[in-house]
Amino acid sequence: EEVCLALEKAKAAGAYTVAVTGREENPIAALGDRVVAYGAECIWEAHLLVAYAFVLEFLRRVAPHPELERIAADLTKLPGVLARLVAGWEEKGRALGERASRWPFLYTVAAGPLKPLAYKEGIVTLLEFTWTHGSCLDAAEFRHGPLEVAEPGVPFLFLLGTDESRHTAQRALDFVRRHTDDVIVFDHREIGEGLHPWLAPMTLFVPLEWFCYYLSLHKDHNPDHRRYYGGLAEY
C-alpha cells in the first residue's frame, strides 16, 4: 500500500519511476514508468543487486572512479560466493541458532554499510519471523547508552565489515566481550572471500538467514506463521 502511494506521488510530482518487483503482475508494476521484474525468491538479495546496479551506473556516468569498477567486477563473483555460503553454512547456522534460542532477546549491532542489514535481521527477521524480542544498535552510538546494559546474560549479535567502519564495530565488540560471553559474530573478513567491503551486506545475508531460520525452529516456531501480518488483522 505504502509503496503504491509513494509511486503515485512521485509520478504526480513529475519524477521518472522504476517499479522493482518479483512478479510483473504485482500492483506496483502498473504504476512505474519502467518495471524490473527479477523473478527470484530471495527478495532482499535481489533488491540489493538492483539498487547497486542503479547506483553504480549513475555514479559511473556522473563521477567515474576506479573504486566503482572494483565493486562492479566483484559483483560478477557474487553468485559463486553466495552459492558456497548457501551450501556451506547450514550446519553453522543450525548450531548458532540453537545457542541463541536460549536467549529471550537479542541486540544486533553494526556500523557503516552493514547497518541496513542489521536492521533487516535485528528488527524485521528476529521480530517477524522468529518472534524474538530485539533491537538494532548503531556501533557508532554504542558508547552513548547501549554500553550500560552490557553484562552477563545480555546477548549481542555483531556484524563486522571490512570497510572503514570496522574499527567502530570492533571497539563495541571488544567492550561487550569484556562483560558477557553471550556474543555471536558474523564477519565479512572471514566469509566474504575477499569481495569488496561494500558487498558485505550481500555475503553476510546468507549466514544470517540460516541462523535466523534455525533460531526459529529451535524455539518451536514456524517462521512462516503470522498472527497479524498480511491482512490477518486490521492495521
Predicted regions and their residues:
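Predominant activation on well-ordered alpha-helical scaffold segments within soluble catalytic domains
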Residues: 51-56, 120-127, 170-173, 205-213
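Phosphate-moiety recognition in structured ligand-binding domains
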Residues: 174-235
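Glycine-rich, anion-gripping cofactor-binding loops and their flanking helix/strand elements
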Residues: 1-6, 144-174, 196-205, 212
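Short alpha-helical scaffold segments that flank and stabilize functional sites
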Residues: 9, 13, 125-126, 210, ...
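Short coil/turn connectors at secondary-structure junctions
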Residues: 12-15, 31-32, 102-105, 129-132, ...
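Glycine-rich phosphate-binding loops that contact phosphosugars or nucleotide phosphates
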Residues: 1-69, 74, 78, 159-189
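Active-site phosphate/pyrophosphate-binding segments
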Residues: 36, 40-46, 50, 56-139, ...
